[in-house]
């Protein structure tokens, strides 16, 4: 695998969604209505990392963030704990899955689309997933995203990696 693009964004949390939406729209030209800050910062990070890179039809999206305490995610986790079926709208509305949906749709990513929750070694976990899919010939490009938030900042790292020919048809050459 070789890294072909990357970006890092950091915004103060006090930056309101409307201002962030305007910034993303001005820089990217994307229609970004009704999106949360989490999704907006990722769209911009991917846009900057991608630059002029032409993603192949065989691309995947691998993202990671700390588990969020949004109502939808909490409701979904409670349902799982109580052995109740997950409500489709709860799953779709969870922050990470919603962000991945918009990113994949915006950048025409039709391959694997995975969001994991983890606070440690996030980029390494994403890379391992992407390496596995590359070794199986499922993808040629991968977008790796990592979000972090604290009480003051929102941060997002985006990396674009591509298969450098190291993987053969049946795994590592």
Task: Provide a role label for each language-model segment.
Residues 1-173:
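Conserved "HGTGT" condensation-loop signature of ketosynthase/thiolase-family condensing enzymes
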